[in-house]
From Swiss-Prot:
<comment type="subunit">
    <text>Part of the 50S ribosomal subunit.</text>
</comment>
<dbReference type="InterPro" id="IPR036789">
    <property type="entry name" value="Ribosomal_uL6-like_a/b-dom_sf"/>
</dbReference>
<comment type="similarity">
    <text>Belongs to the universal ribosomal protein uL6 family.</text>
</comment>
<dbReference type="GO" id="GO:0022625">
    <property type="term" value="C:cytosolic large ribosomal subunit"/>
</dbReference>
<dbReference type="Pfam" id="PF00347">
    <property type="entry name" value="Ribosomal_L6"/>
</dbReference>
<comment type="function">
    <text>This protein binds to the 23S rRNA, and is important in its secondary structure. It is located near the subunit interface in the base of the L7/L12 stalk, and near the tRNA binding site of the peptidyltransferase center.</text>
</comment>
<dbReference type="InterPro" id="IPR019906">
    <property type="entry name" value="Ribosomal_uL6_bac-type"/>
</dbReference>
<protein>
    <recommendedName>
        <fullName>Large ribosomal subunit protein uL6</fullName>
    </recommendedName>
</protein>
<keyword id="KW-0689">Ribosomal protein</keyword>
<dbReference type="GO" id="GO:0003735">
    <property type="term" value="F:structural constituent of ribosome"/>
</dbReference>
<dbReference type="InterPro" id="IPR020040">
    <property type="entry name" value="Ribosomal_uL6_a/b-dom"/>
</dbReference>
<keyword id="KW-0694">RNA-binding</keyword>
<keyword id="KW-0687">Ribonucleoprotein</keyword>
<dbReference type="InterPro" id="IPR000702">
    <property type="entry name" value="Ribosomal_uL6-like"/>
</dbReference>
<dbReference type="GO" id="GO:0019843">
    <property type="term" value="F:rRNA binding"/>
</dbReference>
<dbReference type="InterPro" id="IPR002358">
    <property type="entry name" value="Ribosomal_uL6_CS"/>
</dbReference>
<keyword id="KW-0699">rRNA-binding</keyword>
Length: 177
């Protein structure tokens, strides 16, 4: 069996999981989210532990068991604590401003770039060169962060651009004459 699927998901206090007709519903203090369970995977709940196992003994079923376990664990963390991603704007004159569900970026183009955040993702700008994105949905948060980063990805020569706070940009040396 998959190494990931062997580890059970522990439910923290205040989080409940219900299963009805292959649909897993997770409820917590930050809302509720649902996940469609794959047909090759079955789930058992014992007190505050959720255990995943494949329904048939095949490599594909084991892979799906690990994937479903990771997805459910992300839902549990999302409805309990939520997720956060930080983006840094590095470059002269690069600025960001969050208003409502829009992020306005000045990143070296002749016009400001406006990005509308997807439903469930919120943004704040503690400084003009930092964007903090928060959401319960890890996948949606990562996609929104990647879309914002895509407007001006970090370049390898000067390191200018939009980068994740934990991202290390490999620098290149300029061409010698």
């Amino acid at each position: 069996m998959s190494r990931v699927a062997k580890a059970p998901v522990t439910l923290p206090n205040g989080v409940s999981v219900t299963l009805n007709d292959r649909q897993v519903e997770v409820k917590g203090k930050n809302g509720n989210m649902s996940l469609r369970l794959h047909e090759l995977v079955e789930l058992k709940q014992e007190d505050d532990l959720i255990i995943f196992s494949p329904t048939v003994d095949s490599k594909e079923a084991m892979m799906h068991a690990g994937t479903m376990r990771s997805l459910l664990n992300n839902l549990v963390i999302g409805v309990n604590e939520g997720f956060e991603k930080r983006l840094l704007l590095i470059g002269v004159g690069y600025r960001a401003q969050a208003t409502g569900n829009k992020v306005t970026l000045n990143v070296g183009y002749s016009h400001p770039v406006e990005y509308t955040l997807p439903e469930g993702v919120s943004a704040e700008t503690p400084t003009q060169t930092e964007i903090v994105l928060k959401s319960n949905d890890k996948q949606q948060l990562g996609q929104a962060a990647a879309n914002i980063r895509g407007f001006r990805p970090p370049e390898p020569y000067k390191g200018k651009g939009i980068r994740y706070s934990d991202e290390h940009v490999i620098r290149k040396e300029a061409k010698k004459k």
